[in-house]
Amino acid sequence: MSVLLETSAGDIVIDLLVDYAPKMCENFLKLCKVKYYNFSPIHSIQKSFSFQTGDPLGPLSSESDGGQSIWGLLSGDPSEKTFPALFHPKLKHLERGTVSMATVPHPSDPDTRLAGSQFIVTLGDNTDYLDGKAAIFGKVVEGFDVLEKINDAIVDERGHPLVDIRIKHTVILDDPYPDPAGMREPSASPPPSKAQLATVRITEGEELLDVEASEEAAAEAERRRREREAAAQALTLEMMGDLPFAEVKPPENVLFVCKLNPVTTDEDLELIFSRFGKILSCEVIRDQKTGDSLQYAFIEFEDKKSCEEAYSKMDSVLIDDRRIHVDFSQSVSKLSDVWRSETNSKRKSAARRGGGGWGGVDELEKWRKYRDEDVEWRNDDSYQMVHGVEDLKGRHDGDKPPVRDSRPDVGGGRDRSTSRRSRSPRRDRDRRDDRDNRRGPRDADRRRDDRDLDRRDRRGDRSRDRYRDRDYNDRDHRRGRDRDNRGRDDYRRR
């Protein structure tokens, strides 16, 4: 025997244990048959433990009586509102989905517990706390995903879900018990009463509307974000020169053909596709270095209709033992190439006419390495002697008068040697560096080589002067020694 509970969270199928709890199964079946549970709220949700239902009004209503059994409902006798519950020793709360009647102790006999219409469904395993407090009469066999939804519901501090979860309808799949006297099954599910409607917090429909509205708002926000991102990327490509303008769209009369055989040529494709209309261009893209086919091509038709007809009829057609794929072109590289070539040609023509700052554009200026005032060259590029002739002579020639330079006097009538010696070496070096900076790199390299060669020559001259001076000193020493020896020889003769 089974019962189907249609809830706002989904459907749950319960198998009844009529052999272990016949009276409780009969009470539950007959209450489902008279639609007593319709619109009953699910409340007291304890995560991973249990939830409770079966009261048509629920604990939030002040008019609720906690529910009653089928016999009390039919007779109206308060004494039959509840009945003694039977606890079978073999039935324990060990598995998730165990269904049991909620009970309360008898006012006069605490060992006897009374059941009415409310029942409990466990949401976790090993909920043995309920043993002896709730009488088991069934188990859930289908709808465990619904139990997960109920377990994850948002609840307040008393365990009541913020969004109503209610039993919408009950369907009896098998009923072995005869109907009690006076019971009549309604022909249709009755609408909820005013007392039941007063207990509504947030209906499922309102939640769905809110969820759908939030989903639509999120989708709209995502669409706008993608549009802004695409516009920004297009603007970036336009600034980089890869697109003629940001709003450029791929042409509608160009087909993209791929998966070609490497031996297929432009003429072959043009001949095959020309039956759909006039072809303006047909190009198989090839490698720039090797010239080999990259096995895809672009075909440009004169009108859009011919392009669409070729697309609908030539996809997956066999050409040169290869089944090709045809699609509309999404490339704008050809438009960009045409735009770039036209722009460059306009700039070149404007530059030839002398218009614009540079390249035909007023805002551009040709880059210059040096300023105009820095390229003034000296008229006299000849080198001048730094040392006088007397500086190149030996130390023993210092008593001779200085030799004047035969060239025109630069220092205002003074000796050239004196004028050069009065100038500091650092000043000469700074002037040399300034002169080298104003000249080109090749002249600087040549002058550097000349200076190195001159430095080596002067080093050799100094070495020779040093050896020459040493020879003079040795010669003077030998002459003095010879005179002393001759003097001693004369003394001995006397």
Curated annotation (Swiss-Prot):
Cited SMART domains: RRM (SM00360)
Coiled coil: 206-240
Matches recorded under PROSITE patterns: CSA_PPIASE_2, RRM
Location of the region described as Disordered in the Swiss-Prot/TrEMBL record: 176-196, 391-494
Catalytically driven reaction(s): [protein]-peptidylproline (omega=180) = [protein]-peptidylproline (omega=0)
Signal peptide: none
Domain RRM span(s) in chain numbering: 253-331
Subcellular location: Nucleus
Family stated for the protein in its record: Belongs to the cyclophilin-type PPIase family. PPIL4 subfamily.
Protein name: Peptidyl-prolyl cis-trans isomerase-like 4
Organism: Neurospora crassa (strain ATCC 24698 / 74-OR23-1A / CBS 708.71 / DSM 1257 / FGSC 987)
